[in-house]
UniProtKB/Swiss-Prot annotation:
Residues 566-586, 621-631 have a biased composition (Basic and acidic residues). Disulfide bonds: none annotated. The gene is ADD2. InterPro entries: Aldolase-II_Adducin_sf, Aldolase_II/adducin_N, Aldolase_II/adducin_N_sf. GO terms for cellular component: cytoplasmic vesicle; F-actin capping protein complex; plasma membrane raft; postsynaptic density. This is Beta-adducin.
Length: 726
């Protein structure tokens, strides 16, 4: 067998190019077991191996010593960065989880159990504000332990959680003050029955809670009770004269009550006697030959009372032991030497600083909480007064330009969406604009470049109120009375009715000039002398003159349709063709007065000017038509009178005006045709070529009568249309 195994042991390693699975033989049992194992189990085994290594490193004494040495070295250098705090938390975790494994270290502060050990899941079941209450009570227990006031039994601090349900917080029996945490407190009712058990497995001391429950029942205003029986307080409680006003701390304590305490409060008579002895306002209760109890509306006030009471008892015991008797002590009068008015609310702040309300003993309690936090107790206390004052923000927008607010560092988180970023920037700009100490006015200033180009359009800019030049020298009216502009000796009811009427108009969107002020009725508004307004007025005047000059005569054919205008054009062309045919036959009829009239050389120049005159308004043509009818009547009565010059027959100038508006090319043809339109249609209206008047105008025949004014030809229906319709 040895000969068979030797070649296998001395076999060379597999080449690098060989696949991984080919390196193992398929008959190997270890390979078969690994291959048949599930993937989830394989991953779990790997994680367990990694955790085992981490646990071994954390449990090694060498690693802990190295970590503590690193923290001490960095603390000596004055480095208080976040990395040191993280290392300190790791050391606290190692110290709190493995007390028996490691020896006691010189860094005993870091080995303290944190006060605030409530996690997010634990806080969900708590009442409103209960988390902070638990942290405060646990912090008071730690302070009692640090000051050396804690005793092995009956040293309890209780707190009322809610007045409606009468639930209270108390530490479990058998837990020392240095071990109390926020989660280990037990919630009980007024009878001492457990409502909510803490993280510890210890019970509640119902005998010790009887005194607290009796005080809570007698005084509903009390929320916190601290019970002490230190040597100093027990000695003062055994003296016949009680606490003497021999020190400043004794005056700060306030009124005190004394009660003969037998150790139990089970009987109803004991509770009644305690209630009579305590009274409605007393905050200190001295239990004869036992100790003291401090009451408070808050935890801060109760600790403030017990702190000064303990100091006053220590001073009194020391003074009596050194003086030899009460007759050798100087007692202070409370009326003369009262330093402060002891109350539930005090004012905190300097003479020139902002004044704000603070509870009694709140500043002192916050200082002690900062001390515990610096020692690593992690109190979880919420500070109302920050220790480091924030820097005052600059009010001048010149020192901090607007571009600084929009600056973003590269190491910031993911980029904000553009719409949200724009909204945030708008809000910041609005806030900065509203908080600015400067006052701006919107001013219209004429731009120099635009003024040189001839455009008087102003440019809108924002200027400071001090830099704006006042356009008028008038004095502004200061409104001192809301009814300043109401006339004197008026009925208030009328004023109210007018106000309601104006409001009703505003609701209905009725625009009006509004009420006029009688005080300002005689004030004459001065005309603005600014160059921009003058230029605007001049330009407006020029535009008005241009508009007046460009006014045209109203078109008499504006109401006609395109089809009617086309028919009118065709009719004019047809008449022109008929006139051309008549002109060709004119030499054969020399006696025709209608054809000899246009060729007469003695024609009046007024008539030629009338035929070649420009556009005439319809009103003028109507006036001429009336004159024409009058002259025609006169001609019938007086046959020897001549026809007046410039008479227009059958509205010829209206047709001439329409032709010039329609087309310039047709205007010349229509003017020549219009002179003979009436002669072709009505031969009786033509002027005879017989005897001439002395002025050179042809006289009218008395036998032929003038017809009345008939409708224009374009308004009549043509014969062709009549035939088609028939």
């Amino acid at each position: 067998m040895s000969e068979e195994t030797v070649p296998e042991a001395a076999s060379p390693p597999p080449p690098q190019g060989q696949p991984y699975f080919d390196r193992f033989s398929e008959d190997d049992p270890e390979y078969m077991r690994l291959r048949n194992r599930a993937a989830d189990l394989r991953q779990d085994f790997n994680l367990m191996e990694q955790k085992k290594r981490v646990t071994m490193i954390l449990q090694s004494p060498s690693f802990r010593e190295e970590l503590e040495g690193l923290i001490q070295e960095q603390m000596k250098k004055g480095n208080n960065s976040s990395n040191i705090w993280a290392l300190r938390q790791i050391a606290d975790f190692m110290a709190s989880t493995s007390h028996a494994v490691f020896p006691t270290s010189s860094m005993n502060v870091s080995m303290m159990t944190p006060i605030n050990d409530l996690h997010t899941a634990d806080s969900l079941n708590l009442a409103k504000g209960e988390r902070l209450m638990r942290c405060k009570i646990s912090s008071v227990y730690r302070l009692l332990d640090l000051y050396g006031w804690a005793q092995l039994s009956d040293t309890y601090v209780t707190l009322r959680v809610s007045k409606e349900q009468d639930h209270f917080l108390i530490s479990p029996k058998g837990v020392s003050c240095s071990e109390v945490t926020a989660s280990s407190l037990i919630k009980v009712n007024i009878l001492g029955e457990v409502v909510e058990k803490g993280s510890s497995c210890f019970p509640v001391d119902t005998t010790g809670f009887c005194l607290h429950s009796a005080i809570y029942a007698a005084r509903p205003d009390v929320r916190c009770i601290i019970h002490l029986h230190t040597p100093a307080t027990a000695a003062v409680s055994a003296m016949k004269w009680g606490l003497l006003p021999v020190s400043h701390n004794a005056l700060l304590v306030g009124d005190m009550a004394y009660y003969d305490f037998n150790g139990e409060m089970e009987q109803e008579a004991d509770r009644i006697n305690l209630q009579k002895c305590l009274g409605p306002t007393c905050k200190i209760l001295v239990l004869r030959n036992h100790g003291v109890v401090a009451l408070g509306d808050t935890v801060e006030e109760a600790f403030y009372k017990i702190f000064h009471l303990q100091a006053a008892c220590e001073i009194q015991v020391s003074a009596l032991s050194s003086a030899g008797g009460v007759e050798n002590l100087i007692l202070l009068e409370q009326e003369k030497h009262r330093p402060h008015d002891v109350g539930s609310v005090q004012w905190a702040g300097s003479t020139f600083g902002p004044m704000q309300k603070s509870r009694l003993g709140e500043h002192e309690f916050e200082a002690l909480m900062r001390m515990l936090d610096n020692l690593g107790y992690r109190t979880g206390y919420t500070y109302r007064h920050p220790f480091v004052q924030e820097k005052t923000k600059h009010k001048s927008e010149v020192e901090i330009p607007a571009t600084v607010t929009a600056f973003v560092f590269e190491e910031d988180g993911a980029p904000v969406p553009a719409l949200r970023q724009h909204a945030q920037k708008q809000q910041k700009e609005k806030t900065r604009w509203l908080n600015t100490p400067n006052t701006y006015l919107r001013v219209n200033v004429a731009d120099e470049v635009q003024r040189s180009m001839g455009s008087p359009r102003p440019k809108t800019t924002w200027m400071k109120a001090d830099e704006v030049e006042k356009s008028s020298s008038g004095m502004p009216i200061r409104i001192e009375n809301p009814n300043q502009f109401v006339p004197l000796y008026t009925d208030p009811q009328e004023v109210l009715e007018m106000r309601n009427k104006i409001r009703e108009q505003n609701r209905q969107d009725v625009k009006s000039a509004g009420p006029q002020s009688q005080l300002l009725a005689s004030v004459i508004a001065e005309k603005s002398r600014s160059p921009s307004t003058e230029s605007q007025l001049m330009s407006k005047g020029d535009e008005d003159t241009k508009d007046d000059s460009e006014e045209t005569v109203p078109n008499p054919f504006s109401q006609l349709t395109d089809q009617e205008l086309e028919e009118y054009k065709k009719e004019v062309e047809r008449k022109k063709l008929e006139l051309d045919g008549e002109k060709e036959t004119a030499p054969e009829e020399p006696g025709s007065p209608a054809k000899s009239a246009p060729a007469s050389p003695v024609q009046s120049p007024a008539k030629e000017a009338e035929t070649k005159s420009p556009l005439v308004s319809p009103s003028k043509s109507l006036e001429e038509g009336t004159k024409k009818t009058e002259t025609s009547k006169a001609a019938t009565t007086e046959p020897e009178t001549t026809q007046p010059e410039g008479v227009v027959v059958n509205g010829r100038e209206e047709e001439q005006t329409a032709e010039e508006i329609l087309s310039k090319g047709l205007s010349q043809m229509t003017t020549s045709a219009d002179t003979d339109v009436d002669t072709s249609k009505d031969k009786t209206e033509s002027v005879t070529s017989g005897p001439m008047s002395p002025e050179g105008s042809p006289s009218k025949s008395p036998s032929k009568k003038k017809k009345k004014f008939r409708t224009p030809s374009f308004l009549k229906k043509s014969k062709k249309k009549e035939k088609v319709e028939s």
